[in-house]
């Protein structure tokens, strides 16, 4: 009787349960087995006719609502009754056949059935307390003495179960749909917040002096996003926009100044490449001429020198881009350009908001954010900077910086390295000259004897007490064995030289004894 196919109404199930209680008085074990087969512990329903085992409602995925709002869904019709039945009946309550628990489960639908079908009784008859319950691990429900206490226990248990399941569902459901909704929302809010033209120089300086925490707080206040997506990917204040030209696209389109303007809506959703960040500040092309004034470019602010020959997009970490955002005020674009980007490329680049650092050889020729098909140039607008109309036209012809402004950081960088080296060598030479200043006098005194030895001692680091050792041909450094060997070689050399001199004097017919008396 109870195992007949499930009718699509919880009220019919309720009526069958009441009729079963009145008619079947001695079939308790079979009733329990049928009830267990109808509602297994693994899933809510697998044998319940045409009702699908898992029913997902759009109301459950929005946000976890209070327990009273879940009961208010009962007024929507019998279809909502199925959903409320599947969402609100916990497994532990179904596994136990205690009448008090099941009575609490059927109470909201019973009150609803009173308004729709008057034949439904308001409450189920009470079963004898001697009935044996189906005991399963972690699903034992104790009997409550009165009905009100059981109702309170049920209300304290079910909302936490529902909220935990709904939180897990809402957290894992449809990440691509989340990304599309966030992107469409960022389109609307960025149009309202970001200006079309770059802000004036005093505003840029004021924004630049602000700490990074205030910038991130302002970004977080502009759009509320889930925690797995970084807010800096979608919205950046005007002070941290990335307006810098691209080398590869400037060669294709010499008539437009290709940049990251402040009015771009989707460009900041992908991490900026290394060439897009630094190509304008380190462009070493001799043919590129521009009328940029070097007063707006402070050379100490540029500290990165990437590879200028690499034209494909290189991905940097967010910390490097944050360092590069400090120079964004000096790279303001005079001609703002709006760039559009497809949703698929954004999802591919973003990689779920994890900011995965790609390989430097990773390129996207089809969905590149600077492709010529997506460029929509906007007419140049006047703003309070030092640019005039003629300078704007000149800049649009040559998108890179002037060689003077571009090479000034390198000149200062090279000069800061070369000048200390020059000072070191000069001071070393001065110290060497001061130490070996008394050497030429002594060397000239003994030049007749060992003139060839004075040439071979130019590499030695001189000290105040090395003059005798150096003149004897022994270097002041080395181990004890090396010093002994060199001293022995010096003595042999002096002895040979003296013997050769004596032979020369004797062969010339001179007096050797008189010469030794004069020299010694």
From Swiss-Prot:
Region annotation (Disordered) maps to 110-149, 260-294, 388-453, 471-496
Bias type Basic residues, positions: 420-429
The record's note on what follows loss of this gene reads: Totally blocks pigmentation of conidia and leads to colonies with on a white tinge.
Per UniProt, the ranges with Polar residues bias are 388-401
Q: An example of a Gene Ontology BP annotation on this entry?
A: sporulation resulting in formation of a cellular spore
Where in the sequence is the signal peptide annotated?
none
| Similarity comment text for this entry | Belongs to the wetA family.
The name on file for this protein is Developmental regulatory protein wetA
Name the source organism.
Answer: Penicillium digitatum (strain PHI26 / CECT 20796)
Could you read off the lineage of the organism from its UniProt record? Answer: Eukaryota, Fungi, Dikarya, Ascomycota, Pezizomycotina
Encoding gene, per UniProt annotation: wetA
């Amino acid at each position: 009787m109870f195992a007949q196919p499930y009718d699509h109404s919880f009220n019919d199930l309720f009526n069958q349960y009441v009729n079963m209680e009145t008619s079947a008085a001695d079939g308790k074990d079979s009733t329990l087995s049928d009830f267990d087969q109808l509602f297994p512990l693994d899933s809510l329903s697998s044998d319940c006719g045409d009702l699908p085992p898992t029913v997902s409602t759009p109301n459950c995925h929005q946000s976890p609502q209070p327990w009273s709002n879940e009961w208010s869904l009962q007024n929507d019709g019998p279809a909502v009754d199925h959903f409320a039945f599947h969402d609100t009946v916990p497994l532990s309550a179904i596994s136990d056949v205690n009448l008090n628990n099941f009575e609490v489960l059927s109470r909201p639908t019973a009150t609803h059935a009173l308004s729709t079908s008057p034949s439904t009784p308001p409450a189920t008859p009470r079963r004898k307390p001697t009935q044996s319950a189906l005991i399963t691990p972690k699903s034992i429900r104790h009997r409550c003495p009165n009905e009100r206490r059981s109702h309170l226990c049920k209300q304290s248990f079910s909302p936490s179960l529902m909220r935990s399941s709904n939180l897990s569902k809402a957290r894992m459901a449809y990440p691509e749909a989340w990304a599309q909704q966030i992107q469409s929302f960022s389109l609307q809010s960025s149009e309202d917040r970001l200006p079309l033209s770059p802000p004036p120089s005093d505003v840029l300086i004021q924004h630049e002096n602000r700490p990074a925490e205030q910038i991130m707080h302002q970004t977080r206040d502009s759009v509320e996003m889930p925690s797995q997506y970084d807010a800096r990917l979608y919205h950046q204040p005007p002070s941290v926009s990335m307006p810098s030209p691209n080398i590869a696209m400037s060669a294709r389109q010499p008539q437009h100044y290709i940049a990251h303007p402040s009015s771009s809506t989707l460009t900041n959703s992908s991490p900026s490449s290394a060439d897009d960040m630094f190509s304008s500040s380190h462009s070493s092309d001799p043919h590129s001429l521009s009328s940029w004034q070097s007063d707006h470019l402070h050379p100490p602010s540029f500290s990165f020198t990437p590879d200028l020959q690499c034209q494909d997009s290189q991905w940097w970490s967010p910390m490097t881009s944050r360092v590069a955002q400090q120079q964004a005020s000096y790279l303001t674009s005079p001609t703002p350009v709006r760039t559009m980007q497809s949703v698929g490329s954004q999802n591919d680049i973003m990689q779920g908001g994890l900011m995965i650092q790609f390989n430097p050889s990773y390129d996207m020729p089809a969905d590149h954010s600077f492709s010529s098909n997506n460029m929509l140039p906007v007419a140049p607008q006047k703003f309070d900077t030092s640019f005039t109309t003629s300078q704007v036209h000149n800049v649009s012809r040559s998108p890179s910086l002037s060689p003077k402004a571009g090479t000034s950081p390198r000149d200062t960088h090279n000069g800061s390295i070369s000048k200390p080296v020059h000072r070191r060598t000069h001071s070393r030479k001065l110290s060497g000259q001061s130490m070996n200043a008394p050497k030429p006098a002594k060397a000239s005194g003994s030049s007749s004897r060992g003139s060839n030895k004075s040439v071979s001692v130019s590499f030695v680091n001189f000290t105040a007490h090395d003059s005798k050792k150096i003149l004897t041909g022994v270097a002041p450094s080395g181990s004890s064995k090396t010093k002994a060997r060199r001293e022995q070689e010096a003595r042999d050399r002096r002895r040979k030289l003296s013997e050769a001199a004596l032979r020369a004097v004797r062969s010339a017919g001179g007096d050797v004894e008189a010469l030794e008396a004069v020299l010694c």
